[in-house]
């Protein structure tokens, strides 16, 4: 073992060497997309690691102490398209720092304390479209060297130290600029000269955000004849007077959308005064949006008269106190009221209005009927409404409605089948509690409906005609509902144009084989989060256009081999993740199919085994077929061994007494026999045996010694053992007394079977058959072997007559004398008798 002092002397230099290694020489970055996307965030790097390939297109180097960017800092990565250098402590960017990045489209410099920008700091960025320089100590746009970036579309210099709104001359070169974010700077005044470049060369698609600047003054006429896409002024004014004067300073502006208001956590104005918006009469506005004003009084609505010709009005997070109705002379075509608070549901009398969004509001009284005859688009989502009667022309006051959104509300009772609303193309009830929707064909008149969402509406589908009439439907979402007996029947008979169907989280356990027979155009089917136990592919066979099938988050164990052939040929994406797969040899064909279909299966690496326990969590791709071959061999060998042992046991059990007889034959083969004959007979014939057989043979001349069970068997020993050991082993011959009782006795037949084996094993053995009476052939044939023996061999037949008796006893004694040791006296007596 190495001494402690020597060990320390070895480790300390090694640790010192490792501490000197820079992270750049390791492999610290996360490879998100191989050779394309790398994330190196917050790794204490001082430069780009050497292992990053030159083919990289997306690189995140944020939160690393890069400090200074020298010339050609990124020349090794000519394919870069996105570069994030947020909070890298960058203080100096030298000339040509980004030289060679001809494909870079997004550059993020957020949170760098830049002290010096060389004139050519951004040279070489010929394709740059987005530049984010938030919180980078920029004090003036004129000193920001970006005039050559002609492809720039978005410039974000928010949260800097810019005091002047003057747009530099180089903005005239940025004809593609669409978004300029100057929010949260130090701009207080806006003068006509600041917008000189926009007067000379208008940027018609430019959206300008000046929010959170402490504006005090906008020179009247500064925006005259200026055309903008969007202007945002939120939380800019510290008083209503300043806001009113500033809005008047916007006179002459032509703008697509104007956004005014405050932010939730940046409130400067306590009350909204109707005079604030008077200056809007001097602007040409297409869309107007106002957000986060408290105490928006009823008379403040009069200020909307200056917005009478605006096409779209958005009112967000406002409190309308006492508002009952809107002015009649407004020409609005779209009205959005979102996250507002009303004391009562307002009365709408806007005849030109085509679109109404009334969403996520708080209304203290109940929903009342809407009377807007021109309305085509109605969004009443997220208001916690309860509708006792829905939905018809009488409820919504229009016959032109094409879009109806009642999602995320309370209880909605479907009392009529959309009478007068036959033009509907979009209908959304998701996460509202629907009543009576499955009682009848509620959607029958909606021949033009293309989109229907009844997800999570507590609907139990029991009526098979629930979707009758929806002949134009293309998208059906009904996740989170239930079906009778958790079985999916064919309820889509008329939905022949359906392309997307969502049946996720419906507690489905089984799917009818004909459930999808009427959906030839279906392209996407979501069956995830159900309780399916197997991958039954037969229901999907008619879906010839199916491209995506999601069966994830079920309880699928496997699929039968013959079922895997029935997937539609156009299927390109199959999701089977998060199931209860059994990685056992029984499903070997399915496991092999998973390996063969890697391109078809989504996240196949995430498909893991759930059973057996020793493989739980193991990727299915790691399952080896060789394991099954070994197991098959072991199982086959084990089964064969068990069967062999079982066969041996059965044979031993069946021929146990025959084996005992064999052992006895070997033991007694050389010795003298104790008995001349062992008598096998039925207990019903015992009188004849005692009175005739025993008396004549044992008391006759010569005398014969017979073995009889009632007299010679040893007490306490099993009957079968006595039969073999006392009967067969100690007897020269066997006398079988055949009678009707004998044939019907199981013990007699057993003894006779042992006698046959005994005769086969012992060369001296002989069986003498005595037939007491005539036997019916039908009865005798029940014992086939006995019947054959009596037909092939000579036997004695008992006749109860003087002559018959004489012949019988003479023949029997002769048979018994055969093989008996000769005795002169006995032989003489026998001859005399």
Curated annotation (Swiss-Prot):
SUPFAM superfamilies to which the protein is assigned, alphabetical: Outer arm dynein light chain 1, RNI-like, Toll/Interleukin receptor TIR domain
Family as reported in the entry's similarity comment: Belongs to the Toll-like receptor family.
Compartments, as annotated in UniProt: Cell membrane; Early endosome; Cell projection, Ruffle
Record note on quaternary structure: Belongs to the lipopolysaccharide (LPS) receptor, a multi-protein complex containing at least CD14, LY96 and TLR4. Binding to bacterial LPS leads to homodimerization. Interacts with LY96 via the extracellular domain. Interacts with MYD88 and TIRAP via their respective TIR domains. Interacts with TICAM2. Interacts with NOX4. Interacts with CNPY3 and HSP90B1; this interaction is required for proper folding in the endoplasmic reticulum. Interacts with MAP3K21; this interaction leads to negative regulation of TLR4 signaling.
Signal peptide coordinates: 1-23
Pfam entry (one): LRR_8
Membrane topology summary: Single-pass type I membrane protein
S-S pairs: 29-40, 281-306, 390-391, 583-609, 585-628
SMART domains linked: LRR_SD22 (SM00365), LRR_TYP (SM00369), LRRCT (SM00082), TIR (SM00255)
GO CC terms, sorted: early endosome; lipopolysaccharide receptor complex; plasma membrane; ruffle
Superkingdom of source: Eukaryota
Domain TIR: 673-816
Protein's name according to its UniProt entry: Toll-like receptor 4
Protein role: Transmembrane receptor that functions as a pattern recognition receptor recognizing pathogen- and damage-associated molecular patterns (PAMPs and DAMPs) to induce innate immune responses via downstream signaling pathways. At the plasma membrane, cooperates with LY96 to mediate the innate immune response to bacterial lipopolysaccharide (LPS). Also involved in LPS-independent inflammatory responses triggered by free fatty acids, such as palmitate, and Ni(2+). Mechanistically, acts via MYD88, TIRAP and TRAF6, leading to NF-kappa-B activation, cytokine secretion and the inflammatory response.
Organism: Felis catus
LRR repeat windows: 55-76, 79-100, 103-124, 127-148, 151-172, 176-197, 205-225, 227-236, 352-373, 374-394, 400-420, 423-444, 448-456, 472-495, 497-518, 521-542, 545-565
Annotated keywords: Cell membrane, Cell projection, Disulfide bond, Endosome, Glycoprotein, Immunity, Inflammatory response, Innate immunity, Leucine-rich repeat, Membrane, NAD, Receptor, Repeat, Signal, Transmembrane, Transmembrane helix, Ubl conjugation
Residue ranges annotated as Cytoplasmic topological domain: 654-833
Domain comment (free text): The TIR domain mediates interaction with NOX4.
